Amino acid sequence: MYNFVSTVQKPTSVTHSVTGNFTGPNDKNLIISKCTKIEIFLMDQDGLKPMFDVNIYGRISVLKLFSVAGSKQDYLFISTESFKFCILAYDYEKKEIITKASGNAEDTIGRPTEAGQLGIIDPDGRIVALHLYEGLLKLITLDNNNTPNKINNNNNNNNNNNNNNNNNNNNNINNNNFNINNNNNNSPIQKNVNNVRLEELQVLDMTFLYGCKVPTIAVLFKDTKDEKHISTYEISSKDTELVVGPWSQSNVGVYSSLLVPVPLGGVLVVADNGITYLNGKVTRSVAVSYTKFLAFTRVDKDGSRFLFGDHFGRLSVLVLIHQQQKVMELKFEQLGRISIPSSISYLDSGVVYIGSSSGDSQLIRLNTEKDQTTDSYVTYLEAFTNIGPVVDFCVVDAEKQGQAQIVTCSGTYRDGSLRIIRNGIGIAEQASIELEGIKGIFPINNNNNNNNNNNNNNNNNNNNNSNGITDSKDRYLITSFIECTKVLSFQGEEIEETEFEGLESNCSTLYCGTIDKLNLLIQITNVSINLIDSNTFKRVSQWNVEPSRRINLVSTNQDQIVLSIDKSLLYFQINSSNKSIQLVKEIELPHEISCIDISPFDSFMDTKSQLVSVGLWNDITLRIFKLPTLEEIWKEPLGGEILPRSILMISFDSIDYIFCSLGDGHLFKFQFDFSSFKLFDKRKLTLGTQPIILKKFKLKNTINIFAISDRPTVIYSHNKKLFYSVVNLKDVTNVTSFNSDGFPNSMAIATTNSLTIGTIDEIQKLHIKTIPLNEEMGRRIVHLEDHSCYAVITVKNNEGLLGGAQDLCEEDEEVSYIRIYNDQTFELISSYKLDPYEMGWSITPCKFAGDDVNTYLAVGTSINTPIKSSGRVLLFSLSSSSSSNDKDSLDNNNNNNNNSGANGKLTLLEEIKFRSSVYFLLSFNGRLIAAVHKRLFSIRYTHSKEKNCKVISSESVHKGHTMILKLASRGHFILVGDMMKSMSLLVEQSDGSLEQIARNPQPIWIRSVAMINDDYFIGAEASNNFIVVKKNNDSTNELERELLDSVGHYHIGESINSMRHGSLVRLPDSDQPIIPTILYASVNGSIGVVASISEEDFIFFSKLQKGLNQVVRGVGGFSHETWRAFSNDHHTIDSKNFIDGDLIETFLDLKYESQLKAVADLGITPDDAFRRIESLMQYIR
């Protein structure tokens, strides 16, 4: 079994954020980390502008910006959970990431810290301290006497090993790897590394102090009696030992958790019930309501104000009132609500970035005056979607169109939500008219002051690329049919048919639009070009084709017109003085023209086009002509026998592209060099199986491409990389941007039998819709298809003790519910409140033997009272749907198990009590299998002759496990995922019992399992690895048949809670076999797919992966092979039978020369590799 792992959605949870001057001396940057990648933003007057992101081969544990003497830019220090570290810089002239130093901080002896890895940097940039192992402090001395010239000169001397990163995910990255173990001190940043002993074993936090001549650290630690204290240490000049520091403080409070350095000197000791300032001489304190502070940031350079965020999502400010560097008093005030923060970064002018791993990250502004309506100083400026942590998810084909969507339980506590995630872009319909046979649609704006469609528009290839380029309001929509043209007038939301006096209405229109600077409308038909006064709608000029000829194709750009008549290419211009139509040039081509485009590359610029591009029949070529002479400057054979059907010139992120589509669903992409008038970087990809028509459209001040075909697709650019997102529409024949008073920022969409006005989703690879859970956290979710609803287990955390810190031992109360939501509207239908101390752990729809009609809902719970622990299985029926928005009115009375079965409410039918928690429920062949701690129970719901009613019963059917967390089934087999004993395979016997037939003997802590097929099974384990095991059916040895052999392993690098069979893509009609795929979602908010591939594909991609590792070097010198190697507490082994699809996909973005190097040992061309990658990717993501 061979597997291809590809990320559909990269991590979204923010773990760290820092600010500084990283990309340039005058740049203000925000840098955030999301588990395995960093994102760099530029702060300007318009807000945060994304610059680029970089993948890191490791889970980021420390992210710090620092400066050294003589450097105008800051450096970035990164440390990973696997003890790798690096120091990065940015060359703002070359626009490249540079690795200044890197190394491995792992020690052969030592116990990793229980409190997590800590990394701190001296405020003066002299030294880095890493606390990775108990009792040890690793010191990395920084050379703080270098000038920028010294850094650059040294870097140039190592130029052969320093081929650095561009903006596109580690493309062509080579880094200097300074091997710490070999004491390589050539780095101008890092001088040496030493381990020093630290007396304190249970370190909770540490920080460098400001204003110290010698680097000095403060350490918050816990002793054997759980008392907490602070020690300070000076680092000796030789960096080989710690010297007792200037002060210490005992018994700082059992709830102390954070140390915050203060530029005035000293530290803030942050506890759950207060904040204290200490500097060895002065102590100042302020009490706060009981909470748990999670993140902080300094506001002022002198440290007189700090912002704090807590686990309730409250933002507060601490003010240090001081006189002459002496802190006199602390004042604390709550400012407002934010997402539960993992990081806080103060940007400028009251603007603050809130990074969150619990909910959406935010950009907020702090106001000087409180908003009395919200009782808050906070204004929300922008939200950044985060779907992590994904606790559970289900895969549903809600629209029965063959394309699934994921519905996740995302976020924690008050940031909890359901997220509906689907591949592609949706259209929200606003109005629809039944109109059959529409051949073209053209918006006309309200007046001649602005123009919505001033650039190229073609007929048969329908490149109405400029529709909606400006922001003027559209008043009319011209609709063209085979034998007539109609004008639709829009007054608000009212639509009616009208007429223009000068418009030819008794024939089909190839193009209609406005020439704003000439106050004209232009209409082009098969026989004429008509100019119409845009005020009076009277015709002012006309050009007619010869009676024996017909216009086939047309494209325009303001007063420029090109059209084709058979083999002839004609170029016209509109005379601005007398508003006449002038033929400038006509040439005859060797073959008929199949597509044409005259649009300027930058559609926002009101400039004349210098080029016209065409596609030809017969010789299947793309040709480019210079205007106004129509001199041919480039000829590009496309190959094959399929005609080019549409052509388009466009600029994305200042890169000029020419797209040419074919009649079989393929698309050619070229880059164009204006200086040499040459095409280069030819790529061919597949968008569908039917002819593709390319159209430009505008959305939020960006121009994108709508590719009309059997799989409509939007082509857009992000960070100079092109993306292709499927649009969830069928039977589309034409589209254009449309922006009227009644339908602002919309799209007009023609199908085979209707005209629709709608708004388009935000353009991105995945569309994510948020359903808030009203400050509840979703824990488990299932879809009940028979009842058209979702069942969700939620948890609500009630904020207790807000009035003070007097009862610190009391826990925040958690209440668990079962919520039922309509699967279309997500309205709350019904609710059931679980008992006190009871938590829902598992939920599943089920059917029982002898009852094929009813679908029941089963819920497994855990009850943890102060006295004992136990669990229940609850069996519900669900009546017909109704909706209500009042959750309290829907909650059951828990003292009455026979709560009402009225419409839309859950009815509790039966319950079974167990002595332990019920961690998982599985519907299995007409019964319910319950995982109750170490045992499996079979639950049946049958009719009792004695009681003359249905009764529930259970029996133990298997034992011998440690703790069963997950189950999966296929036919008569059950796969068991044990917390400590890996995976085992059970088979159903004729008497209903379960017998173990094989197990994996490795000590692997399983988190989730799935059955790939009858013989291969996959598990996600606690150290962020995948493992694939195989059933030994063919072995003649009985002992071997009882083992599940490990045949595949791979480090995914993220914690996986759930795996489900399914796919996010709508597969095109094809004779190719369907590729089995399993979707997974992570705690960090990523979504990925594991696809089973053939041995032939595996061999090919293994060789390509090896070639890419020679070309694509990891940032910081981190190794891809090391990163993907299976690793847990017991051993580390190389990845086996897995392909890193993310690395493979980087091939698509490499320059051609790098692609040649990557495929050098494969004996194929880059184009062959490109097509093979695209062929696989379209089936799995």
Curated annotation (Swiss-Prot):
Superkingdom to which the source organism belongs: Eukaryota
Disulfide pairings: none
Pathway: Protein modification; protein ubiquitination
Keyword entries, A-Z: Cytoplasm, DNA damage, DNA repair, DNA-binding, Nucleus
Taxonomy of the source species: Eukaryota, Amoebozoa, Evosea, Eumycetozoa, Dictyostelia
GO cellular component, one term: nucleus
Family statement: Belongs to the DDB1 family.
Role of this protein: Plays a role in DNA repair. May be a component of an E3 ubiquitin-protein ligase which promotes histone ubiquitination in response to UV irradiation. Histone ubiquitination may be important for subsequent DNA repair.
MF terms (GO), sorted A to Z: DNA binding
UniProt protein name: DNA damage-binding protein 1
Low complexity bias: start-end ranges: 449-465, 891-900
Region (Disordered): 150-187, 449-468, 882-902
